[in-house]
Every structure is written in structure tokens, then in C-alpha cells.
Amino acid sequence: MNLQDHAGDIIRKARAMTDIPVETAAQAAGLTPDELAGLEETGVAPRKVNFKAVAQLVGVDGSKLEAVAGGWLPAARDLGLWRELRVVTTASQGMAVNCYLVWDEISREAALFDTGWDADPLFRLIQENDLQLRHLFITHSHHDHIAGVAAVKERFPKLRIHSGSRGAPADQRILANAFIHLGSLRLTNRETPGHSEDGLTYIIGNWPEDTPYVAIVGDALFAGSIGRGNLSWDLARQKVREQILSLPSDTLICPGHGPVTTVAEEKEHNPFF
């Protein structure tokens, strides 16, 4: 799976974060403004880009940005190590989005994290594995992540829904840092606003055979990038640093878009950190 953001996306986000005009960034990059606009749109430039200079200007790491431009990807992960963890990717309107299904191997109790565009692949997975869907956890309320909520609620009317949205019904608003058990698995949450006001990261532990933690982060963090700072760029970056990158280095990061990664890889390779 390709990265959610190419090098041009990263430059565009970093420019927005620092309020650097395209003309100024283009000069640092050794491009014309039109060429930089093309790079930001497609990830491709007609000539060599001075990534380190433009990175220094917009406040990201130049060596890491060069690596992304050169094709860096996080190492492939065998999700079979976690046994009862599945990623389901659906696409619509030119956008692919990930959601995640987790269950306890003994009780078959399951939890869904976001729904993506289409719930039908989830229904098949639940049926194939003879699961009892108990919980739906929402990372944030952007439409691509919750488009299937109505269908899931209709299929599983007793489902408990958990959300950080202020607009959610009172019985759906999850308490910060609350613990929930799913069979032997233990789930908690951390507030990660910035991309959205209601952003939450869910952390799952106590996997069989001491397999590392899993952090389902929504759009707070991508492999090699971060989500757009719709609420606040500074807050988005701060919360990722404090609430996600503070987790153990082998924690599996499961983002809303793009490939899975780890805390260690993002510390080493993400240009924003």
C-alpha cells in the first residue's frame, strides 16, 4: 500500500502550518511557483528539488522528506501476529479509507473502529469468523470514516457506540482514558484533536503472547505524515507527539489512510517529528 501523502503533500501541509507563501517555498526548493504547485498536487517535479532547503523553511525534517520523495515505505507487517486484528479498506469519491475489526479469540466478542465507506465487507468478515459485534469506536466524525454507521446500527441494534464528538448522544460519548474490556483484550483511549475536534486514538493491549500494543489513530497520524490540521496544526502535531509517539516503540499504528506503521518508524522517518 502506498503512503497516504507524497512529498508534495507534506510540503503543502507544512506550508499551511507555517503560513509560507508558495513563491517563497518555490524559491527555496529551486522551482518556479507553478512547478511547486505541480509537485504539491502530484508528487512529481520536472527537475531536481532542494528538499532540505524547503523543509528547513517550512519546519520539517529535510532528510526524512528526501526519503519519502525517494520512495520510503514502512516495513511490511504481518498482522497475523495479532491474530484477531483485520484491516478493511473501502474506497469512494477517489479516497480509500481504513477501518479495523478486533476480537477476542475465546469469547468471539468483537469491536469495530470506524466503518469506512461501505459496511458490507465488514458484515462478511463478521459472519465468516462467527463474531459477536459489541462495540463501534469512532476515531473522528468525518464522513469517510462513518459513512457505514447507519448500516452497522441497523444490522446490530444492540451495538454500543463510542465517540468523542460533543454532538453525540450522551450515552455514546466516551470518557477520556476510560478502560473497556473485550474478552481478555483491554482498550483505552487518548484525545488526539487537531485534525478534528473530536479526534480519539484507541489503544488495545493484552494481546495473546504479549504481542505489542495496537494504536488506532484515525487521521491524527499517517505513515510518514499527519492529517490536515483542520482545527489546529500546532495542536495536531503536539497531540501526536504527546499521545501517540509516547507509546512503546513497537506499538503498531493503524491509521485511517495508508499503510500501518510503528511508533519507532514514525520517530525515525516522519518529517513532521
Predicted regions and their residues:
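A short, Lys/Arg-rich alpha-helix, primarily the initiator
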Residues: 1-18
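Short alpha-helical "recognition helix" segments of helix-turn-helix
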Residues: 21-27, 54
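DNA major-groove recognition helix of helix-turn-helix/homeodomain DNA-binding modules
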Residues: 30, 49-64
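Recognition helix of helix-turn-helix/homeodomain-like DNA-binding domains
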Residues: 30-46
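Active-site HxH/HxHxD metal-binding segment of metal-dependent hydrolases
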Residues: 36, 45, 110, 118-188, ...
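Conserved beta-strand hairpin/beta-sheet module of binuclear metal-dependent hydrolase folds
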Residues: 77-128, 200-217, 224
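Core dinuclear metal-dependent hydrolase active-site scaffold
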Residues: 101, 179-209
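Metallo-beta-lactamase
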Residues: 196-273
